[in-house]
Amino acid sequence: MKDQIKNTTYLVYDCACGSGGMLTEAEIFLLELATGMGKKVVIHLFGQEVNPETYAICQADMLIKVKETDNIKYASTLANDGFPDFTFDFMLANPPYGKSWKVDQDKILVGRKKEVKDNRFLVKHQGEELQLIPRSSDGQLLFLVNKLSKMKDSTKLGSRIAIVHNGSALFTGDAGSGESNIRRWIIENDWLECIVGLPLNMFYNTGIATYIWIISNKKSVERRGKVQLIDGREWYGKLRKSLGSKSCELRGEDIDRRTEEFLDFSESDNSRIFDNEDFGFHKIVVERPLHFSFQVTAARVQEFGEKMGDDLLGVVDILRGLFGEEVQWDFNLVKRDFEKALKVEGWNLKKRDLDLIYQIFTEKDERGEAVILKQTKKGVVYQADAELRDTENVPLKENIEEYFEREVLPHVSDAWIDFDKVVRGYEISFTKYFYKFQKLRSLEDIVEELLELEKETEGILREIVFE
């Protein structure tokens, strides 16, 4: 990136800037980088903060450093975008994660159907309209989407984003959900360069796992179509005294190791390179047919009278005449013969009445024939049993039909795929890719340890009981 720094003006933006510390550090870093390359740059800092106290501190800090205080806005970034017409060269943030954004919903969603009215969070993508709205309990990815809406296309460098998220941003949300749509939009646009795992206990107010997402809309040639994962969870130094939840820090050598892995862009124990498609999958809905048995019984006739009334008891006589009180295992034949007889006898029942009759005199039974929904030119379409419905996640690189034949049909031979419900999703199982197998202890070692413990505790029980 440093080779692309020019003698020009750069805009730096933090949409959750707090007291402005990250903005200030970003400016220092960029100035040092430019100076080292013999370039003269002008840097303008932009930020937005919702907390009044930290906003005031940020404003004061900007005044002391003779910066443009008008570029620091006080409001919720999600509800009131302070820079709707701006694009930025560099963007960074450590947004709140695991925090509800319900207070901002009315500014983003409208109506009973919660339609998106803020264009930052509704995009056209590959012929689809994607809603980039995560669950209301966690709005961290909305801050990322806000930044993506402000990327600059007009320069060779484009825009570069570095943002910290917790682990849930990597995988939370099923295919078609707001979270998955956001990941899909980013990865299919080939913006995601790298995700770097950080140590636990890095921040004052939480000890959970966190990750840096590095995003660019102008990737270098060798990175196009690729995503790099760097496992830096064990590269840190311990603080002598904890500060809240923060008990570790990144030393210079820890930062250098991460930087070297990123620049090297190759496979190692702590670096993995993937194709964009490796994180995608098709969620398919697997259906199985409904099976009914049919029988006219005294209990069901009584239920019929209670629900349908005495005026329709003549229908029961038709059923008895056709099927007696024997169990019928092919509901399709029952339905055909019964409805034919109704026409002959002059009965004109509404569909809802027919459906209720079938509901009363049938029950689900695997011994019965599969219920036919309709006949088409392509063949028979069976009625699906909602209770047997299942889903499978098929990797994008796999053919759906081949996967289905290999993984599903050997176990449920009557299943089929509802192709109208196929949805594409994305998730990044970071820890899975860096899992290190821990060899189990041998049985001999465990037995030996138990025997040693038994020797150490010999006589203790006797002392407890008899003293």
Where are these regions (language model features)?
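A conserved structural/catalytic subdomain of Rossmann-like adenosyl-cofactor enzymes
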Residues: 85, 89-462
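Conserved S-adenosyl-L-methionine
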Residues: 1-93, 97-113, 166-168, 174-182, ...
